[in-house]
Every structure is written in C-alpha cells, then in structure tokens.
C-alpha cells in the first residue's frame, strides 16, 4: 500500500498475538513484516498450554464474532482434549465443573499460526532482536533499520515499545512450571490457597504427561521465593521432568490505552490476559485480529488506529471488566488462612467460584 516506507506495518513478536495481527492484515493486502528474536517461534515454551475449545470460547466470550475462523487449531497442535476442570481447595477437596479444553503442543501451535500468516501474505524475519522504535523506524540490535507506517508491539509485557512509551504499571505474576512424563488423568486442575499465594497452581494433563506449575503474587509470599512454592507443588506429582520453564503473566487486565500515534500494543504488551484465570493465548488472538483489521482500514480508508480500542471494548470489555473485578476480590480472599478458604469453597458457593473463573459477574450487585 505504501511506497514511502519499507513496509505498511511491522509487528514486533511473532507469538499468537503478533502472528494473528499479521494474518488478518496481510490477507487484506497490507505489506506486513513480523520480527522475532526466536527461531523457531514458540520456543522455548513459556506457558501452561491450556486453551478453551471453540465452543467453550463462544460461551466465555459471547461478543466475539467468527470464533471458528479465528481459532483454527490443527490436530497435530493438540496433545489432548479435556471435559472437566477441578478447582482444588487447600484441604484437597475438588469442586468439579464441565469445561471443554484443549491441551496444546504450544510450539506446534505457534508454528501453525506462523504458517497461516505466511499463507495470507505476511513476511517474517526470525532470529533478529529489536532494540527500539522511534517514529516510523524500527532499530534492530544488529544495526539494521526498517520503516513502516504502523508499528505493533506484540513482544510481551516487557516489549520495546511498551517499555519505552507507556508509563502505566501493571501487576506481573512470576510463574514457574515443568513438563512431566506420566499419566495424570484427563481433568484440568487449579489449586488455590497457600500453595500459591495470591495466584494459583495448575496441573494440565497431556498425552503421556502434564504441564505442572504455579504463579504467585510476591507481596503475598511472606518472604518465600517462587522456587520454594513451585518446587513444593511440583514434588507432589510423580514423573520424570523433561522440561523446566518460567515466565511472567500481566495480571492487571488491559491498559487504559493501547494506541499512541502510529504505535499499537497487542497481547501481553497491552495486558490482554484475563486476571481471574490467566488466559492469554486466545485473548491475545482476539486482540490480534482486531488490530490487523483496523490497520488495513487505517491504511485504506484513514480510519483512526484508536478504532482498535473501541472494537476491543465492544468484544471483550465486559469479560475483562468482570475478570479484573474477580481478581481483586480473589486477592483479598487469598489473604485469608487456608481453613477459611476451605469454608468459602463449598457446594453452596460452587456457582459463584465458577462465575469468577469464567469471567462472569460473581454477584448480581457487583
């Protein structure tokens, strides 16, 4: 579209958010380049790998259109499917819920998103690190400079544009996890209480193994380290550890604004993680599609880039608002001792707990 710049749009980061931006922009004719320091994209693994099925997403995010077009997960990217989620209280009691989920092979999943974006016409530059962006120019660490009319930061909560141009702070929960061989059943587990202060621990079963880990709020940890909590929790499971990973989840919800001038944030850099359950992959892709489509409309019809924020709020505003509220209430609850949490998590409150996890209003007055 543009002859003044090297590209119409440059996307920093080729994960689910960035590749989805590229896919939807490129299929409408936008000349887009994705730059990612990893090769292959998606490696090393940095998350729990669980996503809702398409039908579950339609229930969780009813204002998001064309879910089946957005989420095209091939069989080879799915380790196993599950139909139950167990919320585990400190006493070990399980509140059981129906939940249709997909346990991913995350690296394969992300590589598939790259393939779809490339087939749509997107360009990729891997193994290259972005140093900074100024105006319409992206500066790489190797000294290369590239220009674009629109520059998107999909590089995570510490992405170069987010870090340089956004002052708004957000709570980031450190996480540590492992992949373990063994047989762990077919129900997703979320554990709450002192096992993971201010956060939660998880066991997500996969074919022949599981993804096991936790995240904490350091202010709740009483001087103990993430490693202390992670090692204690993981040691409860029997199996051979084949991979250890760590990362961070932004848990304050979306920023007040994720467009400044010709800069856009998407995915973790924009806070597109649901605080009440840590869901980020599918949420980032929802934001990525909106951003990609708005970039095309901006270049073609001079639609303001801020339309991205407007459409996001229309599709995800209610869900994010409910999730942020549930996280705040949960943060207060999780300061309580385990015996009180055991009393609060019971058959009478089972529905309220599930509404919090699935980003519905917990109470009709809140």
What are these regions (language model features)?
Residues 24, 38-85:
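N-terminal FAD cofactor-binding segment of flavoenzymes
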Residues 254-320:
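Conserved mid-domain beta->alpha element of the FAD-binding
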Residues 293-366:
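C-terminal helical "tail/cap" subdomain of flavin- and related membrane-associated enzymes
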